[in-house]
Curated annotation (Swiss-Prot):
Tissue-specificity statement: Expressed in shoot, mature leaf, cultured cells, and at lower level in roots.
Intramembrane segments: 271-285, 641-655
Extracellular side, ranges: 116-152, 210, 255-270, 286-308, 475-493, 545-553, 617-640, 656-676
Other remarks in the entry: Rescues the Ca(2+) uptake activity in yeast mutant cch1. Plants overexpressing TPC1 display reduced growth rate and dwarf phenotype, and seedlings show greening of roots under light conditions. The highest overexpressor line shows most severe phenotype including a death symptom, possibly due to Ca(2+) accumulation to toxic level.
Top-rank lineage group of the source organism: Eukaryota
SUPFAM superfamilies: EF-hand, Voltage-gated potassium channels
Protein known as: Two pore calcium channel protein 1
Amino acid sequence: MRERGEMREAKAPLIAEAAEHISHSHGSGSSGTGSHTSGGGGGWRGSRQYQRRSDALAYGNRYQKAAALVDLAEDGVGIPEDVLNDTRFERAMRFYFVYLRLDWLWSLNLFALILLNFLEKPLWCRGYSQHACDQRDLYFLGQLPYLSKTESLIYEGLTLVILVMDIFYPLSYEGLNLFWKNTINKLKVLLLFILACDILVFAFSPQPFRVAPYIRVAFLIMNIRELRMCAVTLVGMVGTYLNVLALSLLFLLFASWLAYVTFEDTPQGKTVFSSYGTTLYQMFILFTTSNNPDVWVPAYKSSRWSSLFFIVYVLLGVYFLTNLILAVIYDSFKEQLAKQVSQADCTRKSILEKAFGIIDATGQGYLNKEQCLSLLDELNKYRSLPKTSREDFELIFAELDQSGDFKVTSEEFATLCNTIAIKFQKEPPPSYLEKYPSFYHSALCEWLKSFVRSPLFEYIVIFVLLMNLVAVIIETTLDIENSSSQKVWQEVEFVFGWIYVIEMALKIFSLGFGAYWMEGQNKFDFVLTWTIFIGETLTFAFPSKLSFLSNGEWIRYLLLGRMLRLTRILLQVRRFRAFVATFFTLMSSLMPYLGIVFCTLCIYCSLGLQIFGGIVYAGNPTLEETDLFSNDYLLFNFNDYPSGMVTLFNLLVMGNWQAWMESYRQLTGSYWSLIYFVSFYLISVLLLLNLIVAFVLEAFFAEMELEKDGEADIQDPTLEGRNRRRSVRVRTKGTMVDILLHHMLSNELDGSQNRDQ
């Protein structure tokens, strides 16, 4: 029995990196063929099997190397073309895969960098008094603890060391020349130097301003490929966005001048539109509808006909001009996104061409049938077909051989990525119990594994979830009524916790932990089940010794979270299946854009702390005259990072946002503070949120079309329909997002290809 290759590398990104090498990590390559190569396809079956792609690329024969490269291309690992053509391919790839396996460390360090922003003591505290930030009630501060200066320096020092390793490790497999060709690497080194200088200045001579919070966010964007692609896409559409903003500004200037002149001698002009600057300010807020109809109440009292002016303004500004802006910027966004996807496809194609060249060692320009079958057999160590017979491999070969001459050219070979996305699924590592075949493959174990994988087991779990839901409803109702019977139902919920642990154990036993962990639903169930089970066990075992656990409220929230598993019931209902599947796919595709919004909030939060930090405090006489005081918004301030992020979220959803803008203008005594809030609106709301809304709409329609195609395939009794049905079943989340993007951008990608030709 051939041993399956175990995929131990860190999970790679979805799409390969752009041709200009905008990547988090790079690999290296050459056209070496290894010492175990064979002729046209014979002799390869006796080759040594390798557990990792890195070992296969470094030591394997040419089919093993090519299979590893094809698997990298399908996983979306971006290897720069210059590295692929390097003569130190095998050696460099060993370092490259070590870097990938350390991805958990690099990711954890990025998380630590952002977390530091939330834990740092605000810089304004040192300007007031040594213990200013200890008076949390006085300054309406958040509840997160602050690090001392020494603790912050130690924290920053550790993250800086790991960041240095992350940035300079690629030198081991790229080499100095290729490393410095990459613009992103140059920018990383520059920002790293600035960050180190900022830490030194903070250590020996603290200043009221630091650049470190902004650099941390910049590293987050540059090191996460999806965020970097979004940032590059947004930068590419800046010119178009500025053009439509200029058009909007002209409309606003003209409408404000018209309003100022029209209502000059009326109560509206005397109380609200007292000057052109004030009129412009109020009309801008009306453009966002945040002060509608408050701003034109005086005019409406004087004459009902005056409402026509404001109605026309709102209709033109909000429902025409804003949507026009959205249409223009989204069209530009799709064009820029198509460029990123096209460049990623080119990089993926270059990796496939490298794999083709490794197999075609004699330079014939094509692969014969035996060579393709040898490659597919090696590739099956990374990806799994439902059947691994030679007949299945020949079907794949027939799909590759589009010309029907039993020769696969480089162009035909490039379609292998699409074939893999349809025919193959990731091969999970074998279960550890495979080491004991006499037990694991006994008749009883085989029956148990078959039962756990059957629909009947799934129906039983759903029934248990429904019973658990009833128990939670009864227990919470009794808790509200302070009934003594609540204790009994808490014990019933404890029994349900044991049932879920048994369910989890049976699934891991039947599937193996690797296959179990590949499902996102199983990850959610695993974490939630163990958290609830451990919490409930400690609560019952030590009800009085652990004061935190004695409060069962937090467990109740987790129990309610467990009920989210009932969404699987919706997947059993045909009319809901497409909507639920579309929702989860959209969530995956939206994460990079939501990440950009989060990074924008982080940057503005750091800026807000350094501009407005410390000016909202109890006893400030100016504060009592502001809308923050009258609306009881004092907790929503920029005195520390957590409070600032919550405040910016309120501004993001446009909930009475002019209250903060006007209040901070009064507190600072300067109209320049308005720039902060207006720019935040233009970037976060008018640009980013509108893009997200438009993206969701188009992605939803595209995904629904794909789901309908999938349902049609299920009804197709032909061989082609059965093959497509199988493809629907084995698609991974990354593949589904990739298919969704290509479907959405099909017109743009076709146009780009035609221009290239």
